[in-house]
Amino acid sequence: MSQSDPTQTQKPATPTRFSGTDMRVSFAGLSFKNPILAASGTFGYGVEFEDIVSLDRLGGFVVKGLSRESMPGNPPPRMFETAAGMLNSIGLQNIGARAFVEEKLPVLNMLQAKAAKKKHDIVVIANVFGYTTKDYEETIRILNEGEGIAAYELNVSCPNTKHGGISFGGDQIGRAHV
């Protein structure tokens, strides 16, 4: 991405330099200081890792999957070691959209404000899942009540229980409705 790119509608992210290389990238209208993003499910809600890694050093991160209501996830055992590696079955455990907006997002907003003072940014993307189209709509409506989420990642691999357990991801019409 060139800094003089006339299609750029957003202020470019603060560059991260590696051996003099500008690492900035732009994707789907978002600017990232580098292409390193922590994937959903690997980084909790982000706030848990602030003491380990400065979030403003990442290009961004995707918070673990959020649903309209909290979910306890699967009962133990959730992990099993095999000769081929680890298997897990967490079951999409999460605190729910409302608790995320009330408990986690204010902390992320504070970290974003702190980063902005250093002319850095923290790009937060929320992973959203549901079992019906209405679940996705309602979850995003609740998350939109807060500030600081740059984009949504739709987890369309959850079973659509209203339609015989078919996942949205495998159904082109279902994906289009989401």
Each model region followed by its residue ranges:
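Alpha-helix N-cap and loop-to-helix initiation/capping positions
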Residues: 167-174
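N-terminal capping/small domains of soluble enzymes
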Residues: 2-124, 129-131
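Glycine-rich beta-strand-to-loop/alpha-helix junction loops that act as flexible
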Residues: 40, 154-157
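Conserved small/polar residues in nucleotide/adenosyl-binding loops
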Residues: 176-178
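Residues at the N-termini of beta-strands
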Residues: 60, 150-151
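Catalytic cores of alpha/beta
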Residues: 47-52, 134-146
